[in-house]
């Protein structure tokens, strides 16, 4: 079971990772450390040659049974740290500003605890220390490598700075939004700015398209569903006295329900093309699917709550986040459940002064160990 020495070890691992962050698909030293720490506990590491970074490990219980997976992401962000911590990043321009160092150390702790509880495991627990979550590419690599073959369910977490330590946010259904990107190119006819009647002004059309897109959600998506359309870049022209040939805009759409995700782009296309045509211009609409939404399987809600209760921790109804998470790609393949882990942080994710309370390390380690035991006892 967890004790002071265990907690101290988790802190040391987390601080080591924090001091030496590595960007997506560059987590070479991070991978070596994870392997070493697991090998020190005689935990089996699976050979997955398709993964150049990241670690897949496994603990088999003394009883045959299903295989479940627990995932932790391991990459950092291109951010200059401003925490002034004694263990602040030693890598210029790179920081664990989203707490993946916390996730990694915690789930190594879970593996350590479950290694001591093999007799209780009615099946196998596979640990996925995943690279490149920040660029939404790591989960795809893990799936392509076949790591989820034969796995019945997968579990994961994200630290939550606005929840106190010892509090876990749980809910069934949508938790994090789908993430998609769009581009719109408005093609007009360039000319002299003083003679606009001889041109087709793509900027004028673009302005109206921006306004028109604001109605896509409010007038086309159910008020019982959530969706956001954000235009984040608009570009046109190179000179103050020339009407350009075209204008461009791009942005992101966030949704929680599949129905909304499917409906939004067609409404956007109709608005863009219709308004452009009214100005005598043409609109070319492009849609780039990025990530689905995190959808928690309600089958595991009771287990997620029971694990916390057994340990004396509190669960609360998790608030949805419009952020994206490539854990959702696993959930497209197998059932899964993702939780918020309270860390009582000072700043939100991706902030250069992001910190968290290290007391949450042991909480997270214990929680996922208990959850694994319960799920393997109850999974159909």
From Swiss-Prot:
This is N-acetylcysteine deacetylase. Ni(2+) 2 binds at residues 98, 100, 158. One of its GO terms (biological process) is cysteine biosynthetic process. It comes from the Bacteria. Its cofactor is a divalent metal cation. Binds 2 divalent metal cations per subunit. It comes from Bacillus subtilis (strain 168). It catalyses: N-acetyl-L-cysteine + H2O = L-cysteine + acetate. Keywords: Amino-acid biosynthesis, Cysteine biosynthesis, Hydrolase, Metal-binding, Nickel. The keyword Metal-binding applies. Pfam families: M20_dimer (PF07687), Peptidase_M20 (PF01546). Probably catalyzes the deacetylation of N-acetylcysteine (NAC) to acetate and cysteine. Is involved in a S-(2-succino)cysteine (2SC) degradation pathway that allows B.subtilis to grow on 2SC as a sole sulfur source, via its metabolization to cysteine. InterPro entries: Amidohydrolase (IPR017439), Bact_exopeptidase_dim_dom (IPR036264), Peptidase_M20 (IPR002933), Peptidase_M20_dimer (IPR011650), YxeP-like (IPR033846). Pathway: Amino-acid biosynthesis; L-cysteine biosynthesis. Ni(2+) 1 binds at residues 98, 134, 350. Belongs to the peptidase M20 family. NCBIfam families: amidohydrolases. One of its GO terms (molecular function) is hydrolase activity.
